[in-house]
Amino acid sequence: EHPECDFEDLAMDFMDIRKRVYVFPKMGEKAMFVAIPTSSGTGSEVTPFAIITDADTGTKWPIADYELLPNMAIIDADFMMNQPKGLTSASGIDALTHALEAYASIMATDYTDGLALMATKNIFTYLPTAYDKGAADPVAREKMANASTMAGMAFANAFLGICHSMAHKLGAYHHLPHGVANALLIELVMRYNADPAPVKMGTFSQYPYPHAKER
């Protein structure tokens, strides 16, 4: 909607002071933003975030502003049935990482925790089946679609952690799928997070592993 905007004004390092003063242009005045995901992973259809890769330098620039939030999200698993196995696994791990980091976030709330935990449960239950059977198991595809969106809703409000920060750099430098970069880092990040807050991290995941004694 705003071709006059300079991308350099939007793509800034996380600690760049300009982020505190730059006003993102008002969106939605010419058209409604309807997002229809075709993979079960990013949750972008319900988040205010975008990642833009600079083709010349390979740098991945994260952009965050609620003007980027779609007006409507249509979650229809029919658009996701024929994801290849590589996309299914990488995007599924991305969704799981969203849920885990939103749950561990210092900005987590009862609302985001509920979404993150249910997303985690469904991913553990249905990602292996979605990977193995693909379109032959539409229930698994639907559950993964819902899990991805729930994880997106969780981290849109609780935000993410250092796993995603490092995964963006790792993926850009080594040309890795984002979900694969997350998969390489998430265990180390969880161990790091568990050191000061073992009780909360012990809750991951309650379903195939023992329950934490307390929240």
Describe the function of each predicted region:
Residues 20, 57-59, 82, 167-172:
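Glycine-rich, charged/polar anion/phosphate-binding loops
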Residues 173-215:
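Gly/Pro-rich interdomain helix-loop hinge
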Residues 128, 167-171, 187:
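Amphipathic alpha-helical segments within well-ordered protein domains
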Residues 41, 149-182:
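Glycine-rich phosphate/pyrophosphate-binding beta-alpha loops
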Residues 39, 99, 189:
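Active-site pre-Tyr helix/loop in NAD(P)-dependent dehydrogenases
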